[in-house]
UniProtKB/Swiss-Prot annotation:
Pathway assigned in UniProt: Metabolic intermediate biosynthesis; acetyl-CoA biosynthesis; acetyl-CoA from acetate: step 1/2
Active site location: 145
Residues that bind ATP: 14, 205-209, 279-281, 327-331
Entry's EC annotation: 2.7.2.1
UniProtKB keywords: ATP-binding, Cytoplasm, Kinase, Magnesium, Metal-binding, Nucleotide-binding, Transferase
Family: Belongs to the acetokinase family.
Domain of life: Bacteria
Protein residues bound to substrate: 88
Subunit: Homodimer.
Name assigned to this protein: Acetate kinase
Species assigned in the record: Campylobacter jejuni subsp. jejuni serotype O:2 (strain ATCC 700819 / NCTC 11168)
Reactions the enzyme catalyzes: acetate + ATP = acetyl phosphate + ADP
Example GO biological process: acetyl-CoA biosynthetic process
Length: 396
């Protein structure tokens, strides 16, 4: 099948084109709504690039240029030649708990739950509507970050607030990065040559946004992110878990509005708030130069990660493997080392030489004697979205 995967942001569209699960092209529409907008399409088979720089006022104009570049490159005759288009959607809310093909109800529901993800869902919705208009005959699939976590038990996803907040307002833990956690856990099963239904793993997706997921027999049973992606780990610019009573205290102390506090927690906190950097390469360079705040930021990040992974050892009946994925998880050997060293008493024995090797691809980095496997699995959310889209089209 010919599948286009779209990740529509407020001012951008990222895309990948798959033909029978092989990436044929990828690209980006950036600075939508600005005069110096740019569209880049790259033929991934020969690395040839096709570019346009012009004013793009909206997503519809952006996708129209993408269509022109597909024709110019000869990769795809037209968007109507697609079998399907898979859209990454951050939040499905309580009712859209599974991936699905798009219809009028799905469009309305994505719009309704935009209040839960105001920075993401409206842009995703614009991407879907643009694709429907550009290629009416092509099936569109909504692939939700939250869907993988639909298998969490109620005692894991409920907050200890008055029940009406859940019952009437859908306030509960949803979890995110689901497409990534689903992909790497399935790849881990193949790597270990085990049935996914017999495997228990803890997946750590570590990027500027970061989350951990406890996966029992292929199903999510708990995850660190909650009602929003703010809960859980210390992240690049997000604070993660904190005492909620701090928020009214900060409001009175600094005279900040709710919106300003939200910005503070999401964009000015995390390791960035501690040391002024959110790129871990910069943080580790600063540590080498004796920057104590950078050292503190890294220690806080790793300590919170250790706490979550350790708690999921208690949640799972047994743990077969820990998976590191995402930009930091895949590339930062120091983070992996610091985390695994603190978990040694749980049967994790890291092979320091394997961990330090700068190689790409799926690999095992534990010592042969380790009771728990430690894997580095590069995530591929677009491939997973394409796979699920094919599956949904096949069923219908």
């Amino acid at each position: 099948m010919k599948i286009l995967v779209l990740n529509s942001g407020s001012s951008s569209i990222k895309f990948k084109f798959f033909d029978n699960k092989v990436v044929k092209a990828s690209g980006l529409v950036e600075k939508i709504g600005e005069q110096n907008s740019k569209v880049v399409l790259k033929n991934t088979l020969n690395n040839e690039s096709f570019e346009r720089e012009l004013t793009i006022n909206n997503h519809e104009e952006g996708l129209s240029i993408v269509n022109e570049l597909f024709k110019e490159s000869g990769i795809l005759a037209d968007l109507n030649a697609l079998d399907g288009c898979g859209h990454r959607i951050v939040h499905g809310g309580r009712n859209l708990s599974e991936h699905c093909l798009v219809d009028d109800y799905v469009l309305k529901e994505i719009d309704r739950v935009s209040i839960f993800a105001p920075l993401h869902n409206p842009a995703h919705l614009a991407g879907i509507k643009t694709m429907i208009k550009a290629a009416p005959s092509v099936a569109n699939a909504a692939i939700f970050d939250t869907a993988f976590h639909r298998t969490m038990p109620d005692f894991a996803y409920m907050y200890a607030l008055p029940y009406d907040f859940y019952d009437k307002h859908n306030i509960r833990r949803y979890g995110f990065h689901g497409t990534s956690h689903a992909y790497v856990s399935s790849r881990a099963a193949k790597f270990l040559q085990k049935d996914q239904n017999e495997l228990n793993v803890i997946s750590a997706h570590l990027g500027n946004g970061a989350s951990v997921c406890a996966i029992e027999k292929g199903k999510s049973v708990d995850t660190s992110m909650g009602f929003t992606p703010l809960e859980g780990l210390v992240m690049g610019t997000r604070c993660g878990d904190l005492d909620p009573a701090i928020l009214p205290f900060i409001s009175h102390l600094k005279g900040l509005t709710i919106e300003e506090i939200d910005t503070l927690m999401n964009k000015k906190s995390g390791v960035y708030g501690i040391c002024g950097y959110n790129d871990f390469r910069d943080i580790e360079r600063e540590i080498e130069q004796g920057n104590d705040k950078a050292r503190l930021a890294l220690d806080m990040f790793c300590y919170r990660l250790v706490k979550y992974i350790g708690s999921y050892f208690a949640v799972l009946p047994k743990t077969d493997a820990i998976i590191f994925t995402g930009g930091i998880g895949e590339n930062d050997s120091l983070v992996r080392q610091k985390v695994c060293e603190r978990l040694a008493h749980l049967g994790i024995e890291l092979d320091f030489e394997l961990n330090k090797q700068r190689i790409s691809g799926e690999r095992m980095i534990n010592h042969a004697n380790s009771k728990v496997k430690v894997l580095v699995i590069p995530t591929d959310e677009e491939l997973e979205i394409a796979r699920i889209t094919e599956e949904l089209i096949g069923k219908n």
